[in-house]
UniProtKB/Swiss-Prot annotation:
It is found in: Cytoplasm. Its main location: cytoplasm. This is Homoserine kinase. One of its GO terms (biological process) is threonine biosynthetic process. The gene is thrB. It comes from Saccharolobus islandicus (strain L.S.2.15 / Lassen #1). Pathway: Amino-acid biosynthesis; L-threonine biosynthesis; L-threonine from L-aspartate: step 4/5.
Length: 311
């Protein structure tokens, strides 16, 4: 029985004002997907996992992309798919996107499809449909490419890797006792359909500040760019502790802070000027004030999805 296994890292989407556009892959967590071909003359997908995930192929973020690839390319096979979840689900860390990305990469390797990175993103986006009903591309793009990416087009898929000329580390405040049913879907429903022109202009300034800050290596521009006048504000009921954590992060000279994806996790960028211990200590106390138990994770920028070599 031939098998392939791939690993994809967690990610934080939006990065302030870059809703559905920007995302950052990090080493905080990763998902692994192993796909084995049992037979090539029938069509069936059996799912195994260490987590409580849907076992119906069309409802599973790792396997629905495979269903679509097989339909589109006329591939017939009976598959056994093992999804090893390392990324906490529903916490704004790109869990479904990483599973989808790892699955598509393993499948591409198994069937020698040699998919381009853009095609990996295009197919992995189907996993987000299975997860939340919306094919948002930001998390899967980060998990595919690694680093910080900008999705500049969805049809056709076009992703640009953002050069990082400023060295920073990552702190994540990850709530352990917060569970919001269908969180991503609910969070997307909270995004306003119309916005004030002044908010749009401010957000445009933020996103350009962030990108220029990354490219030119300017700390102050990165800090300014990690702000948002629209989506974070609309979703604040999902993470009421965020404003105070951000205030603490800036107080102790973090590069900047924002909500990780749709939340409720919080992303903090740090460097040698930052007092990480104070941010972790006071940020954890803030979580406790809201009856939220937060784990603080230290991470770095991650690379893209890769096929694991078997010993």
């Amino acid at each position: 029985m031939e098998c392939k296994r791939a690993r994809a890292y967690s990610s934080s989407a939006n990065l302030g004002s870059g809703f559905d556009i920007l995302s950052m892959a990090h080493t905080a967590f990763f998902d692994t997907v192993e796909i084995c071909v049992e037979t090539k003359n029938s069509e069936n997908i059996v799912i195994e996992s260490n987590s409580k995930i849907p076992l119906e192929p069309n409802r599973n973020s790792a396997t629905y992309p495979l269903v679509r690839i097989m339909e589109e390319r006329g591939i017939k096979a009976s598959l056994r798919v093992k999804v090893i979840k390392g990324i906490p689900e529903g916490l704004g860390l790109g869990s479904s996107g990483a599973s989808a990305t790892a699955a598509v990469m393993a499948f591409s390797s198994l069937f020698n499809l040699n998919l381009s990175k853009e095609d990996l993103v295009r197919y992995a986006m189907y996993g987000e449909i299975a997860s939340s009903g919306s094919p948002h591309p930001d998390n899967v793009a980060a998990s595919v490419f690694g680093g910080v990416v900008s999705v500049v087009s969805v049809n056709p898929v076009k992703v640009v890797e953002i050069p990082l000329n400023y060295s920073f580390n990552i702190l994540l405040f990850v709530p352990l006792n917060v569970h919001i049913e269908e969180k991503t879907k609910k969070a997307r429903e909270m995004v306003p359909k119309t916005v004030k022109l002044s908010d749009y202009i401010n957000n445009s300034r933020y996103i350009s500040s962030l990108l220029i800050g990354f490219v030119k290596g300017e700390r102050d521009l990165i800090r300014l760019g990690l702000n948002d006048e629209i989506v974070e504000k609309a979703r604040l009921p999902l993470f009421p502790y965020y404003p105070k954590i951000k205030e603490i992060a800036i107080k102790y000279d973090a590069v900047g802070s924002c909500v990780s994806g749709a939340g409720p996790s919080i992303l903090v960028l740090t460097d040698k000027m930052t007092d990480e211990n104070k941010i972790a200590e006071e940020g954890t106390k803030t979580c406790n004030e809201f009856n939220v138990e937060c784990e603080v994770i230290k991470a770095k920028i991650a690379g893209g999805v890769e096929v694991e070599r078997r010993n």
